């Protein structure tokens, strides 16, 4: 899949200490990501990961990052993220420790994920006041079915000069043609399986407003010879609040090289027909009152 990624002119790979309990970082090391010219960003979550428990306290940040670096087989990464807020640790303590790690050369860019806009502002003001490394990137969920970040978060990020990386641009898979109201069978490990530990996606999207929104999008996509996936990726590329000149980017997850090839190709295609753009707007008006908060 790295070959496919680089063939399309991309070099960034996103991972986290919690993904596969560290195994994804180890797998990247086996793939010799550094020799390929890949830029890796990893995240530290304030929770128990396997036998170890992490926080965003000063005494936990360096060991947590060190575990990631060891797994990746590297002395540094391109981006280090705080993976969801640690509300048990004062931000000043965390940010001072992050700044020390930055000055020591462990990473080039600093990122945060899943923080509320007011928290982003507080973080940036603390960093500015103390001369600490300010966040370069905010990573959050954003798709045609989850746009509540547009109202307050995007203006905040623009004010502080922070780029936005969108994960889950297909709303966990709902913006495909795989699922409908009648779906009752799921592949093993499926994120919409109510018996799966990852079934929290079901709580986010498996509801009547979501299916009503899909009823609006899918016929128009079919009319123009597109899958829902293709339409959703073209929407986020051309009709969302994301701006390439601000350093914004889409984080694409794929289970195969073929799927990655398809998703990257769809992101490269042009704007949507106007009636399909309007269908996405109408779909958002249906689901927005039912949308979960963008922050943790």
From Swiss-Prot:
Induction: Does not seem to be up-regulated during banana leaves infection.
UniProt binding sites for substrate: 83, 201
Site entry (Lowers pKa of active site Tyr), positions: 47
EC numbers on record: 1.-.-.-
UniProt keyword annotation of Glycoprotein present: no
Tree of life domain: Eukaryota
Pfam families noted in UniProt: Aldo_ket_red (PF00248)
InterPro entries: AKR_Detox_Biosynth, NADP_OxRdtase_dom, NADP_OxRdtase_dom_sf
Described purpose of this protein according to its UniProt entry: Aldo-keto reductase; part of the gene cluster that mediates the biosynthesis of an emodin derivative that may be involved in black Sigatoka disease of banana. The pathway begins with the synthesis of atrochrysone thioester by the polyketide synthase PKS8-1. The atrochrysone carboxyl ACP thioesterase MYCFIDRAFT_190111 then breaks the thioester bond and releases the atrochrysone carboxylic acid from PKS8-1.
Similarity comment: family membership: Belongs to the aldo/keto reductase family. Aldo/keto reductase 2 subfamily.
Any one GO MF annotation of this record: oxidoreductase activity
Positions annotated to bind NADP(+): 14, 113-114, 139, 168-178, 191, 255-263
Protein name per its UniProtKB record: Aldo-keto reductase MYCFIDRAFT_156381
Taxonomic classification: Eukaryota, Fungi, Dikarya, Ascomycota, Pezizomycotina
Record: active site: 19 (proton donor)
Enzyme class: oxidoreductase
Protein keywords: NADP, Oxidoreductase
CDD domains with a match to the protein in the record: AKR_AKR7A1-5
Pathway in which the depicted protein is active: Secondary metabolite biosynthesis
Keyword NADP: yes
